Amino acid sequence: MSQPGRVDKQPGYILHTQPYRETSLLLEVLSRDHGRFSLVARSARRPRSDLRGVLLPFQPLTLSWFGKGELRTLHAADWDGGVRALTGLPLVCGFYLNELMMKLTARDDPEPRAFSVYDRAVRELAGGAPLSTALRRYELRLAQVLGYAPALSRDSRGEAIAADRHYLCRDAALPEPDEHPELAPVGRVVRLPGEALLALDADDYREPATRGHARLLSRVWLSALLGDEPLASRQLLQAIQSLSD
């Protein structure tokens, strides 16, 4: 008879680990089809455990587990390979990916697109992509796929974004046509050219100006979504957002 709530061979990543009881680990995982939740890896801290070299952050895994409720039990884990271990600044950026994912997602709320956004960001960091590009893409796209922020193809009036116009991006709302370009934006708002919004909507970060505009937009969106103290280290967020290619 199969175990209750058993799931086999599900793509996933480990977001956080901590010791659990004498020899086990408590894992916070992000799975493709089941969202974010907690798993117990029994005896994973024993010296001869096969899991010791597998349960690593920022590595694509295939996870199997059983059980229901808030805490499930890991049955098996396999390393999918193909991703270089993160070190140095990419590793710090990886911790930021994890913290932002845990802040913006609810447990047991599956969103396969969020998993894809995370997977792409990890692979970009491991593959030597420009760090600021990888992070800005992750921030903006994650907010969009989770339903917190809009697509950037249309404005607040429902009209197509025009490349030759400027728009006010306020909080995480649709861009508003800028009717008063002579006035400086006030509050949690940034003025951006339509050309930049269209580039971001097309996932085109090739131009340095576009990457700079992405940084401004991500600051506005994350400030609206996370509040005044969004992360354990506010300085870490500020340092990462100041990166430039």
Curated annotation (Swiss-Prot):
Coiled-coil residues: none
GO BP terms: DNA recombination; double-strand break repair
SUPFAM superfamilies recorded: ArfGap/RecO-like zinc finger, Nucleic acid-binding proteins
CC per GO annotation: bacterial nucleoid
UniProt keyword terms in alphabetical order: DNA damage, DNA recombination, DNA repair
Gene3D superfamilies: Nucleic acid-binding proteins, Recombination protein O, C-terminal domain
Record function comment: Involved in DNA repair and RecF pathway recombination.
Family: Belongs to the RecO family.
Name the record gives this protein: DNA repair protein RecO
Source organism (scientific name): Chromobacterium violaceum (strain ATCC 12472 / DSM 30191 / JCM 1249 / CCUG 213 / NBRC 12614 / NCIMB 9131 / NCTC 9757 / MK)
Taxonomic lineage from the root: Bacteria, Pseudomonadati, Pseudomonadota, Betaproteobacteria, Neisseriales
